[in-house]
Amino acid sequence: MPYNPIPQISLWAAAITSVGPMIAFAAIMILLRKKPRASAVVSLAAVTASLVCAVFLLIRHWGMEMPMQATVHWMVSGDMVIPLGILLDPLSLLMLVVVGVICFLVQVYSLGYMAGDPGFSRYYGFMSLFAWAMTALVLSPMLLQLYIFWELVGLASYLLIGFWYEKFSATQAGKKAFIMTRTGDLAFFLGILLLLAAGGTINILELNNIVLPGGLNSLLGALAALLIFGGIIGKSAQFPLLTWLPDAMEGP
């Protein structure tokens, strides 16, 4: 599938949507652990900037004729190059706004919900980690990059479910969620490896060029799709990997 380069202003906006929460997470966990008010301000500022940039990108590029992509080389080994990048298409633009709105509303609500909790700063640090992982996942043009942030989403979920770690039930709930979702994630990773072996690439747009015209073996394609769907089942608590969800209520 052909694509256009990302204009500079849009590239900066896309970077801010993801990098802002990442910086907030690092700042809170390293510098602001004992400053709850500052932690909330930094986290909310980052997620607000992320939402504003997401809305800007949606308005600016909605109705685009071709997706836009920018990549850089991350790891090079012989003839194998593993890039990182940003992909903007109608689906990712819409999901960026959805993620931004939900993260913003949750963090605003949490100002009152978590008020007075000894782990207030830590909570906002974990929420910033969650926002970073989600936005970076949505922007990923490579399946390996997507998988890395998929796992970071799982880590953030584990940290939030087991947030009140003084309670044995909370730590057990966190472990249960982590282990059960890893089962699905293993299937997801195997699906990615199968697509790489069958198609020779982990670039989503390049895979579209191979799959849509029927250039991928139908059996391998179906198996890869089922494996990737297994990861989705685990993360979204669908049958049979759903018993961790009620226990997740142990977290905030």
Question: Model-flagged regions — what are they?
Answer:
Residues 1-252:
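...captures the hydrophobic TM-helix bundle architecture rather than a specific catalytic motif
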